[in-house]
Amino acid sequence: MHHFFKGQFFDFETCRILGTAVYGGADVAEVLEAVGQIRDGDPVSWGRAWAIQAERALVLAEEACKSGDRTAARDAYLRGSNYTRASGYMLTGEGPNRPDPRSREIVERVQAIFRKAAALFDHPVQFLKIPFEGGLKLPCTLYLPPPDRRLPGKIPILISGGGADALQEELYYMHPSAGPDLGYAVLTFEGPGQGVMLRKHDAKMRPDWEAVAGAVIDFLEELARSQPDLDLDTSRIAFSGCSLGGYFALRAAADPRVKACVSLDPLYSFWDFAMEHVSPTFINAWEAGWLKDGAVDAVVRMMMAMSFQMRWELSIAGTFFGQTSPARIMKEMKKFSLAGGQLRRVQCPVLVSGASHSLYLEGNHHTMRIYNELVNHTKGDKQLWLTATPGQGSLQAKMGALRLANQKTFKFLDEHFGIERPQL
């Protein structure tokens, strides 16, 4: 596979942006131009390069609006939104739980630009709020199929959730970009620790995502009752997610109202993920009490000073966990696990995938452990999708292979929701 950068981190994140081109989130030459302006491992040049492309895309969007070119305007707004997201992606602030104040401004700008694009979509889109604990309201977007793409009967629903760092607007390039044309309603949302909920409301991430998912499903059921003209089928609700979002999807799938689950390249345990980046001897000494938290913090901060990727990872994790100490961040990670029989609670059909070239997760540990612990399933009710090359989906979260991920996802849902399509 060709690489844009020698460093895996910037290379993967570039593939992540370029991969959205199939659904309008990028243009190849714009990406190549940005790459040429970025120094590997330098977050400042990264942010500047994508900000330039964002502004250029927005100029094109306004020109297209003035000339009445709906498609060009929509696509340019999509690119402007996605490049704006990318421009703020590498911001680390002053360290864990000390975010850059620009992060909130960028997230809100991404949202505003994306809504301009959504107003030009060929299918209905609703921007809604989900009531949640403590008076919070989770932002969500409901993408509905156009009338000519409706399936017989009521509309099946896919809830597509984010993970550690994706914004709701980026989630569009996964399932919402394909689902409505296949007759599905797709709902995306941001929960505690994600997107605007983190940057604007300082709502921290929580491991018991079934509580979050339950509120989302409650909202959908009430929406279906109060707006029967939407024709939503709450007896056919699926839940999906990628990476940490795949973990969240499996937690959500314990709710009996979830009738199918798609977990793409999930993690089994956040702690296990972290331990792949740290010496086992060092961690064992800490857990045995031979090293204090302060010593761990000092060593990890030295590592952060030498590696931008580690600095970014711990800064992001510390912010969504609400912790400044590396030792406390790692302790928080222990709470995010599917161990202890969690997967025994899942009764619905599950599609779970792995990524052999993952930047973060070792598939044989995470994916296969999840698959093997889905003990309440017959072979037909749990499907395993392992990939060998990037074109087949071997990059984490199926980056660069979004069309393939959608094809696999909706084929699986069709099978378990009783949807039959005529051969072409």
From Swiss-Prot:
Pathway: Secondary metabolite biosynthesis. GO terms for molecular function: hydrolase activity. It is an enzyme of class 3 (hydrolase). Keywords: Hydrolase. InterPro entries: AB_hydrolase_1, AB_hydrolase_fold, FrsA_esterase. It comes from the Eukaryota. Signal peptide: none annotated. Its EC number is 3.7.1.-. The active site is at S243. Induction: Expressed exclusively during fungal penetration of host leaves, the time point at which plant defense reactions are triggered. PANTHER family: ALPHA_BETA HYDROLASE PSOB, DIENELACTONE HYDROLASE DOMAIN-CONTAINING PROTEIN-RELATED. Belongs to the AB hydrolase superfamily. FUS2 hydrolase family. Hydrolyase; part of the gene cluster that mediates the biosynthesis of a tyrosine-derived cytochalasan acting as a fungal signal recognized by resistant rice plants and leads to avirulence in Pi33 resistant rice cultivars. The first step in the pathway is catalyzed by the hybrid PKS-NRPS ACE1, assisted by the enoyl reductase RAP1, that are responsible for fusion of the tyrosine precursor and the polyketide backbone. Homodimer. This is Hydrolase ORFZ.
